[in-house]
A protein has these predicted regions:
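Nucleotide-activated sugar donor-binding and catalytic core shared by glycosyltransferases
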Residues: 1-380
Length: 380
């Protein structure tokens, strides 16, 4: 059986790799290929297009990159025609993957969409398009599954994949030793995003905040887990321009999260990961003014951060656009560093978010759906 994956971002690479590993447990002979990154490659997926070449995040940025996406879709269509996969697994990246799903449908290839478009948040009309082109939606939120059912899509709630992935592998003492963390130091985690554009937009501000925090605390450490879509040298160039000693880490991010006091995170999957590790977080979100303005008109949710959307209220503070300044960041971080009760209170609310996400096993359930759909096509 042949399985084609399409993931366009670091988080999608992570989730696709988990499914690929689970598929190998079901059938070690499965042939997997597609668009992705290093984690998918390690999981045994032949990478036909490396996602390092992607990385736009807003409407304006997407418009500028349209010619590249048209060429990529044409290239992947040729790959499909040559490889003849039994199923296409689209993972997140809806602006591109929706178009690729239409191509697969045209070629008679079943499509499973995992981490599907957020029709519950915006662009609900996509529900009709998904019903037309997608064979099965593997939904990660219960309220999301209900939204898809309203459009008569074939959807199955599988649970959230992070429940299978997010957990420490070391004790706190072991993690402190591994990362060179001082027990008494205040420890801040910096997660500026997985796309170069996010990093360009947010890391400079994070580091300026770090400079102010260093003047307030004698013993403070900063850690930055490197997304595998960002070169280490690019991060080092940014960091060298500031008087902030940052430890760039390459692995064991969840072990790192359990020893940190506060996280500054770009909006996205990282905020749900920190929620599941019960790490107090300040969310930062900044895109072009045009992208933000259009987004405000079409998005129908009251929060940006996934933990807040799941909770139905603000659990972690959200700084948007012009509010993303060192002064405002420091004003929110300081109480979480100095007020033990405030820190504990946020951790308690994040624990509730964790509970609302359901039970582990999502990855295995998705792999079984992929395998069964692919086998049906394979046996035709």
């Amino acid at each position: 059986m042949k399985v084609m994956f399409s993931a366009g971002e670091a988080s999608g690479d992570t989730h696709a790799a988990s499914v690929a590993n689970a598929l190998k447990e079901i059938d070690p002979s499965v042939d997997m290929f597609g668009m992705g990154g290093t984690l998918m490659e390690r999981a045994g997926v032949r990478i036909v297009y490396d996602i390092k070449n992607l990385g736009v995040i807003g409407i304006v940025e997407i418009v500028k990159s349209l010619p590249k996406f048209f060429k990529l879709r044409t290239y992947l269509k040729r790959v499909m025609m040559k490889e003849k996969p039994d199923i296409l697994v689209c993972v997140d990246y809806p602006g591109f993957n929706m178009k690729l799903a239409a191509v697969a449908h045209e070629l008679g290839i079943p499509v499973l969409y995992y981490i599907a478009p957020t029709i519950w948040a915006w662009h609900s009309s996509r529900g009709n398009t998904i019903r037309k082109y997608v064979t099965k939606v593997a939904s990660i939120f219960p309220f999301e599954a209900e939204a898809y059912r309203k459009y008569k899509c074939d959807v199955e709630f599988v649970g959230h994949p992070l429940l299978d992935i997010v957990h420490p592998t070391m004790t706190k003492d072991e993690a402190e030793e591994y990362f060179g963390a001082r027990k008494e130091a205040k420890k801040i985690l910096l997660m500026p995003g997985s796309r170069k554009q996010e990093v360009l937009s947010l890391l400079d501000t994070m580091l300026k905040s770090g400079e102010q925090l260093m003047s307030n605390h004698e013993d403070i450490q900063f850690f930055l887990p490197r997304a595998h879509t960002i070169d280490r040298s690019e991060l080092e160039t940014f960091i060298d321009a500031h008087n902030v000693p940052v430890t760039i880490t390459e692995d064991h991010t969840y072990d790192l999260m359990q020893i940190c006091d506060v996280c500054l995170a770009a909006s996205g999957t990282a905020t749900l990961e920190t929620a599941m590790m019960e790490l107090p977080t300040v969310l930062l979100y900044r895109v072009s003014p045009i992208t933000y303005g259009i987004g405000k008109m079409v998005v129908n949710v009251s929060h940006v951060g996934l933990p807040n959307i799941v909770a139905g209220k603000e659990v972690i503070p959200e700084l948007l656009q012009d509010s993303v300044t060192p002064q405002v960041i420091v004003s929110l971080v300081e109480p979480l560093l100095t007020d033990v009760e405030k820190n504990k209170a946020m951790r308690s609310e994040l624990r509730e978010v964790h509970h609302k996400l359901g039970e582990p096993g999502a990855v295995k359930r998705v792999a079984e759906l992929v395998y069964n759909l692919g086998k049906e096509k394979c046996n035709e």
